[in-house]
């Protein structure tokens, strides 16, 4: 689907990482396939979530530390990082009752019990991933002065205002990643080379002219 802008699209969403497995080999395979199918001058995208699927942080059980590894991968890999709103503060799914859902899909799923849906991996309503952005701890979390049709998600303590004051927060981490990416040509424009795994470590180089950035990502539960 990619082309030079005259015969195809300049950029496409790649959903290969939507249902990711949290391990080095899974992401090494994605990066290698990106280089095979979207080699320079084309650009891949690295997308973890969107408005049609459960919030991606749920795949690591809401772990902020694991999500930081994924964010570092997203902003250091070659291509365009795409974040779904709220990922930068670790927002989790809501718990919208099917009877109260606005999503048309919920009406088709209204006879499926929740416990059975969880067992089968069925997403009863997309409203769960479309809850209001959590700006602060004021009423409706600063999203609106009126009552929104979806309730706040199940992690109401994760707000922009709260994380802005915390130098170790996920939001601060995202801002640091953006600043580093912006200030190094190797990270925002460089080629991707030497993609490999060593146990639970994923590593690759980003190279632009004489500048090289070596990236190492630890997917294990042991600090390296």
Residue ranges and their predicted role:
Residues 26:
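Active-site-adjacent loop/helix micro-motif of nuclease/hydrolase catalytic cores
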Residues 14-16:
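Extended redox/cofactor-interaction regions of prokaryotic respiratory oxidoreductases
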């Amino acid at each position: 689907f990619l082309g030079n802008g005259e015969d195809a699209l300049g950029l496409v969403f790649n959903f290969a990482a939507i249902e990711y497995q949290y391990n080095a080999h899974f992401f090494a395979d994605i990066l290698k396939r990106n280089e095979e199918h979207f080699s320079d001058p084309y650009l891949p995208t690295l997308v973890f979530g969107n408005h049609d699927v459960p919030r991606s942080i749920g795949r690591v059980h809401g772990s902020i530390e694991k999500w930081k590894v994924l964010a570092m991968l997203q902003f250091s890999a070659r291509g365009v990082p795409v974040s779904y709103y709220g990922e930068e503060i670790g927002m989790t799914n809501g718990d919208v009752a099917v009877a109260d859902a606005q999503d048309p899909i919920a009406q088709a799923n209204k006879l499926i019990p929740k416990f059975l849906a969880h067992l089968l991996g069925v997403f009863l309503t997309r409203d769960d991933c479309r809850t209001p952005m959590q700006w602060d701890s004021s009423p409706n979390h600063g999203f609106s002065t009126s009552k929104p049709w979806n309730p706040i998600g199940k992690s109401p303590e994760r707000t922009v205002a709260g994380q802005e004051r915390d130098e170790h927060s996920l939001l601060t981490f995202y801002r640091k990643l953006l600043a580093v990416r912006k200030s190094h040509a190797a990270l925002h424009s460089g080629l991707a080379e030497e993609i490999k795994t060593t146990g639970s470590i994923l590593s690759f180089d980003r190279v632009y002219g004489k500048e090289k950035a070596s990236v190492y990502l630890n997917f294990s539960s042991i600090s390296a």
